[in-house]
Structures are given as structure tokens and as C-alpha cells.
Amino acid sequence: MKQIILTGDRPTGRLHVGHYVGSLKERVALQNSGKFDEIYIMIADAQALTDNAEHPEKVRQNIMNVALDYLACGLDPEKSTLFIQSMIPELTELTFYYMNLVTVSRVQRNPTVKAEIQMRNFEASIPVGFFCYPISQAADITAFRATAVPVGEDQLPMLEQCKEIVHKFNAVYGDTLVDPQIILPKNQACLRLPGIDGKAKMSKSLGNCIYLSDSPEDIRTKVMSMFTDPTHLRREDPGHTEGNPVFIYLDAFCRPEYFPEFLSEYSGLDELKAHYQRGGLGDVKVKKFLNNVLQAELAPIRQRREDWEKRLPDVYEILRVGSETARNTAASTLRDVRHAMRIDYFEDSNLLRKD
């Protein structure tokens, strides 16, 4: 069996460091590992419209933003197929068929759906399209016969629901769909990066993000304003590193080589944490170190983005060709699905037979 990856992001804004450590960095590593035969990276504009139906221009404008961030992070169109979701109409048909295999109560129990509904204040006014997006996501994954899906921790319930749909379809119609495996970040701190305000999730809608394309000054301003340990009021006070966003970011981004370069009085992150915990280390010093770490990590990404911004027609062509390639694959899967369901009526003359 071919080893295939499918993953993607909603184009509702520029991508941030939460996206990067949550899945983008892992995608690039998997792409360059040589272990996968095909890699599909989807810009999920149709999914973005489920809660932006009245603002399609917002979605349209961010297609290129997300594509630029992808290329800047190291996704290579020679190795990965970058495409736009709405350009693949087969995904809509697959979603429609899968809806018959999922109950309303099952979608309501999905923790990710419940959290998103609460965050967007939808409650009883939730759009049907948004409510059904776990089913749409299952169509996205199965259409490309993905064997592996690298995701952040918050998407784990979605992948579990996708696997349920695959199992149900195969049980009813025969072994047709590929059962995908979930790939989570290895670094625990990368599972979910909190917002700079200390909230549990970094979110564009909450305005608590550090974007991959932020200027050096924007990064510095955001880091220096970050929420820390509220009990660490004075430098001499003992502080908590657990649950402290500044240290969570350091866990996610810091490398051993950054200490000799930026904070040579410490041998490593463990020593820095120990000093903070016993007291005598101020938040400003730790934040300055984090700023240096993030500047070093994000500078090459920002430079590559600026280079691609000068080649927008090339980016457009990458998406156009990628969407054509993706559609061919999805069309093949849809033919298999229709055959398994015995609704490929005009593929042979069996429709003329009387049972």
C-alpha cells in the first residue's frame, strides 16, 4: 500500500507559531523523510466558509497568505501537492454519502465541535455546514487515501470520528476506504501552544497569536507582553514554569545551541527553569531570551516568504496544478465509493437487469 499524507489549514488568516509547532514543522520533516509516496496539503477554503459565509472575501484573500506560509516553512511543490479544497467537487459528494453513516448525537459529542461552537458563540444558531465539518474532514482524508494525518492535539477527536466513518463504510459496503493513522507532534509542548495572553488556545479570532510573518519588532512586542506566572510578582519570588506560556514556548522552540549564543550563564533550559523556580530570576530576562530564540527561528521563514511574495504568479501556478492533481485522485476514490455503494449506474448494463 502506498504511504500517503493528507493535512491542511483553514485560510482565515496568516498562519502562526501554533500552526508551525503543532503540525507544519512535522509536515516538512515527513515530506523530507522520503518515507511517503504522496503528500497532499489542502487549503481548506470550503471548511473556512462554514463560519465565514458572509465574508467570502476574507477567505479568498487568505488563500495566498496560507500558500506563502506553506512555502516559507519549507513545503516543496516538487514533493508535496498543494491544492484548494473547493476546487475538488468530489469532496462534496463524498461528504453527502458519509452523512448517512453518522448520527447528529455523535457529532454533538465531538469535543472539538463543542469547543469550537462555544468559542464562536454559535449555540443554537450553529450553521449546518459548520456542524457537519467533521464529516467533511473525513471526506477530505479518505478522498486521497491518506494513510497518515499529522495534526495538532485539538484535531484528535476529528480524526477519531473519521476512523469511525471509515470502519462503518467498510462494514456496510465492503473494504473500500483506507483507515488513516494519526501523527501527533513528539514534543509535548507542541501539542497545543497557548496564546500569548495565557488562554488555552492560540487563535486568530482571539488576537493572541505570534504570526510566522510578523516583523522582528512585532515579535518582540508580543513576547514582552506575554502572560507569565501571576504569583511571580518580584524577581526574588519563586516562580512556576509549568503552565507558564513563556516556558511552554521555550520548551517548543529552544535548542541547546541558543544558550551559548543568547544566555551563556546557563547550561540549558533545565538550569534556567530551576533558577526561576527557586526565585531570583525576573520575567523580563526570560522573555528577552525567548524573543532571541523566536527571532532566530522565524527569520529564515520570514525571508523565504518575502522571496515567494516576489513570485506570486508562480505560487498561483503551484496551486492550480496541485488542484488538478488532487482532483484526479479524489475522482478515482469517488468512483470506488460509488461502485461499492452500487450507485455507479451507467458503468455497466446491470441496471437493465430485473432482480
Language-model-detected regions and their locations in the chain:
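A generic structural motif
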Residues: 11, 149-150, 208
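Phosphate-binding beta-loop-alpha motif at adenosine-nucleotide cofactor sites
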Residues: 80-85, 144-153, 249
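N-terminal Rossmann-like or analogous alpha/beta NTP/dinucleotide-binding catalytic cores
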Residues: 2-139, 257, 296-298, 302, ...
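Extreme N-terminus of proteins, especially the signal/transit-peptide cleavage junction
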Residues: 1-3, 346-347
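Conserved nucleotide- and phosphate/pyrophosphate-binding catalytic cores
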Residues: 157, 163-355
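Internal, conserved structured core segments that host functional sites
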Residues: 113-115, 119-169, 173, 194-195
